[in-house]
């Protein structure tokens, strides 16, 4: 074809063509038929196509035979137009029904296809007259057919999503072009256009084409049907059909719009002709309409009404829309689409609650396709959306302008979560209510809401819609899954996986080549070198040959193979030159330098390898090459060795490039082996003596790198778990606490140790201006600590002698001059081997120079303490000789400065001491290097800038620093990243690292008791303030231009009294003992003001934003020193308390005041408070000379929290003690209880850490302290003292704040009393732990009423900072917000909510037992625990709701609606998900899915892949650490249904159950342990409760180690890398629950209305058939019919009563007389066999009714009294019972009324007398009948009621007809009358009999059979 000049070939073939041409055209075309191609039988499609269509169409003589036309075009021609869509599809070929894979390319009005995209010739199809449709109803194989006038193609896509994409593209290609071509307009055009949506189907009865009016072909009437309007057409006629599908908007109604006089629009009928349902009845004449012989009569698409052609003009104009009127959006109400892509809606008159339907077409074995079409038929098609094709966003955007609407999600739980997430995105919670239709597998949410476990039948969809209309509303809690992911290094040994043979072969070749390259570089043996070279050449040749054979057409691969061969030749040349010694390398190096110099950057940047996201920090064979290189015995010159290594490295890279190109799907596998940072290749020699020798670094100084970004990774990645996998199963859980999580610098708060693994340059400037660089190196190889010799260090080391495994101080001092930076132009391009070689050579060359420099530097070395103390200022300022300005990632022991004192237990940093030649005062303590400095490797903190302030005389710092390795997960706050932000007043550097110290301090003040609840530290005794050297932060930053070191050594701290004695009443109140640490800023830190955390701004629903407000620092002038006296006798233990301190200045604008609240538990009284603390004392001690102006006053706030013993009974005391210069005034607002107050120095600003240190008493037994330490006796412990405090992460520490310690404000306390009694006007800013930036800041110029509106924007949780506080009185904010948020009718939830707030978290007390979960709860200990559950489980102080500031670095992974699982359940879900992805055909039905879950669960029973999960995760509920037993999973439930209907929490049957009843609207989570798959299976059958863990409001899970753990949320599973997971309450959404009581009420009411309407219709019809002059005195035709039944019943009763008396002469004879009298009265109304006529008949009937009623009553009385002694014949008993039953029923129809003339007349009720309440009376239980067996004889002879079987058994034909009419099945009356169906025959009717009677509708058959069953049972 290449030599042809024509662009297009036209091949035409007539039916008379030769056989050869037929064969040739058949091979290359889709159809070889002369007419429209028939659709063959495709076995994959569920609804088969009929093969006789072509035969039936060929019989039509009017249709001429079409010519087959095939068009072909060349590649260059069809590339001219724009391509709409292209890709591969399966094309059906007509020979043997095979499928061929073809490449299709769609353009405007043209479709091209060929074998592949590289073909030069394409078949093209003109789409100008196109018809396309789906194949089949369910369309299992995703096939569709394209029909044009000349071609017909059946195509198959891989998924339904792809099929719908192709159909949408075909729609776009054939639709006229529009000015706006975005996807929304295309979807919108699809909705608003009235085009039909065809699918191929078969029909059970003759069906006719709506276009040509001919019958569809074949016996099954196979053809196309519109999925919306059910329009039927031939396949050949589909393109000719007009766009008259169901209306969607007012514009689509067109000319049929009917407008009334007042301007309102009426909804008209939309008629579709022919193909009416079976037994359709005309709405006008009530006769059957429709035909199976032709296309006739009409049906409405909205109200389902059917009419004759002649009756259609008489039909009402307005359409009632139908039974689903409440849910339908009438097209007349949707006027247009506004600019915001939402409908402009005019609500119709009457009730209107539109329903938005989302259907997942893949759910339930493709049942969703049927539901999707059925909903479009019942509702407006624009209300129904397919989640697979359009998603939920389109429907929500269109419904945005509806005030209230309902959403129905027809799918599984995953799709429900998708829709709810979109509702969050559009913020539409208040205007929509969500319902669920269960089409998925588990359907847990649908079960809980009452909608059942499955819904597979779409026939009863109208009735189901009625249920949703009567549903009630409940709130569903939704929970955010916030995830902080830890970057994990690539493991050294790859995990085993199932790989293909080709991959294994390639991997083996690559490994072999690396092995030989290693020997070539390292070996000294000539024979080994030769053999390795030969084997390398053979391996490379084999690799190139094999890859080239499989990729012959790949030009790029061929180029790469040639490059590989060239690299190999260059390596051989280098080896040859090495042997002959002729290679010098000068020309090669010069060439490389010249090439690199062209693109070298001006300033040295970070190494390119650091920017690789796939950097592996594991050592490979290269490390072994480099480690042995310096010991290589081959005497090579450096240039020769460099050339050889470069050649080997080039060969290795070329091999990797070839393999990566041959396997495009797996590029990362080989990149990881290749991407080795220069730091991995370095191993620094260590000094055996422990001496640290500073040296210059040949490595470049790397700028800080943000490791949070997924594209960044540094060499300082730390591994989460320091243990190997083989030891993880038996190690104490506290061992895993040594975790440093990375955080972005812009998000890391200085108050929390974020453990940022950054190479941070910290500058410490001495007095001489010398600059010292400090760096930290942490665990380069997978988290291990490496010393200089490359040895793996232990995670924690004991004090004592120094061993090679002992951890050194992680700082390397490199005294490098910072004058002119030395730039290595090759640093970014040099290979690793060259890099390492230069480094080692430089190090050896500079060793002598460094020793010479050390001789000049005065250093004092203490071998015993392993410390090296530098003398400050002694380093001469001289330039160092630099070879390369590179960084040394080494771990060496730095010389400790003089102000650092180390011992076996503590490390003290004296920040006030000058670094002079004095020795440490703690020489007597044996030492180890402190690790606190490595943990404080923060940009804002240098080693010497961490200062512990103290009093000069009495106040000191104790043992507070130890075991910094065991840092827990820490929270990350958002600081102000701007450099202009100054330090806030009162801030100190110590506060910035308080969380680091707080969680790593083991024993502050050795003999004193501290717990998790301690928030601040204060000393027992404070000496009087002297004229101190201390100044505030602001003063220091301004006044000290040249700061100097202070030389005061730390004295010993005064200890508190021991509180562990038995007679101490406060021994159980130790949680609130307070110690104090005064913090001062470092002098040198003032030169670079630190940046503190300010108010964080957040992006809604996601992470923290890069915004925050800025707090300008106000100047504060200090007039002088304060030498006021300090009375010693007032400092008693009862005076310790909390102070709220205010400092003021002369200028109001510069006045600043800090509020400080400290809490402690002191047994004091109000009298002690009033007697021991005087107001003038406060005045004397806290007034400074700056208060001369009198502005402001000191306010002391004293707060006492509840203790575990007193709990809620102890109420706090709030004392506001304002102080002025003129006098003192104390206003005390006391709720109850008492406190002491200790005055503080006004010049000091004391603050506490936001995270409390988790400390414990050394003497305290760890068994007793198990609750606070998480001690587990089943696990190994590393260090008894070390493990005691490793119990809680920062989230687990309980924070005591003013918000948690104040009770709810009483209503009697006025708001004015809360904050309006003083002249000070507050501006309150909350501290960063809660909502705002600092604890409190008071400015007199900003009134409180101006500040309070700002707090209203803090729409957080209920327990915010000041909510419930009587100090600030912000209760009205919370209450107003709550009232605004909660709606009416929520009073029932009020009490439970308050109760949960008071008691949560509720922790199962059995978890404290060592043998849990084996404790059955029945023993004495368990009963005692349950009895004291409130005391054991109550929190000392309620945990603050996690604020958004602590979520910095987190991102919302997903939202939980149902449940969260980690471990075995998530593993099963993940395996099932993978199975479904691999084999979707095996997971299409619900039964198969349950089977797969069982198989995968049984697999876990054997494999136990999640064993020892408790050692890999840590669980915290509301901040409390939960000790975990041996388990395999943890499940957190929001709803009481788990994985397919299991009540995993268990039902609560005990009255004394401590847990709250589970609910999905109580904002409470249930935490459950999973011990194995057997428990999961047994929980479906047994009510298990021993596995309960807790009920709480927030959960945090810490994932340890370096392995991913399976996690699932609502059935969607994934592998979660190590890090932290926090589950927090997000919002609530309105869900629709089934209301069965309302359904029953509506059903009964509708039944009564239906009966009433039937009676009216009967009266109207009977009146129309009667004479015009008829009156009430004349018996109507209907009444005459009832009268005949009455006469029959009376005659039968008289007959059988007489026969009874004759058979038993002993009975009363008066009954016989009554029977005779009734017989005579009966004869009087029909003398001589004729009924009386006229008004006399009603009068005579009164006597008959009275006599027959008397006869009935007497007979019943007789049988009741004498029945036990009578012995009747069986036939007589049966007939008498039937006669009495019929008589009772007929008497109910009769009524006697007194007329105006005074006469009594009888009337008959034409309705059936049976009441549903009587007819559905339930039988008594079996035991009741058995118990009343003595009266069985009486019961047997009682006259049966009308609800017995005998009553319907004796029905006549007329009664059966009446029964049919009451069921609205009057269309079958004629058939029943014609076949004389009586009651006896009615009770025996079956499905086949009903079909013979003409009842063919499935629904009618079911209704009749169910009604017959009810008659038989009743």
From Swiss-Prot:
GO terms for biological process: glycerolipid metabolic process; phospholipase C-activating G protein-coupled receptor signaling pathway. Gene3D superfamilies: 2.60.200.40, 3.30.60.20, Pleckstrin-homology domain (PH domain)/Phosphotyrosine-binding domain (PTB), Probable inorganic polyphosphate/atp-NAD kinase, domain 1, Transcription Factor, Ets-1. Residues 1-10 have a biased composition (Basic and acidic residues). Pfam families: C1_1, DAGK_acc, DAGK_cat, DGKD_4H, PH, SAM_1. InterPro entries: ATP-NAD_kinase_N, C1-like_sf, DGK, DGKD_4H, Diacylglycerol_kin_accessory, Diacylglycerol_kinase_cat_dom, NAD/diacylglycerol_kinase_sf, PE/DAG-bd. A zinc finger (Phorbol-ester/DAG-type) spans 195-245, 268-319. It catalyses: a 1,2-diacyl-sn-glycerol + ATP = a 1,2-diacyl-sn-glycero-3-phosphate + ADP + H(+). It is found in: Cytoplasm. Residues 350-486 form the DAGKc domain. The keyword ATP-binding applies. Residues 1-37, 621-642, 783-805, 1016-1053, 1116-1135, 1175-1216 are annotated as: Disordered. Residues 23-37 have a biased composition (Low complexity). GO terms for cellular component: cytoplasm; plasma membrane. PROSITE patterns: DAGK, PH_DOMAIN, SAM_DOMAIN, ZF_DAG_PE_1, ZF_DAG_PE_2. Residues 1851-1914 form the SAM domain. Residues 82-175 form the PH domain. Residues 1175-1187 have a biased composition (Polar residues). Its EC number is 2.7.1.107. The keyword Protein biosynthesis does not apply. Keywords: ATP-binding, Cytoplasm, Kinase, Metal-binding, Nucleotide-binding, Phosphoprotein, Repeat, Transferase, Zinc, Zinc-finger. GO terms for molecular function: ATP binding; ATP-dependent diacylglycerol kinase activity; zinc ion binding. Phosphorylates diacylglycerol (DAG) to generate phosphatidic acid (PA). Belongs to the eukaryotic diacylglycerol kinase family. This is Diacylglycerol kinase eta. It comes from Drosophila sechellia (Fruit fly).
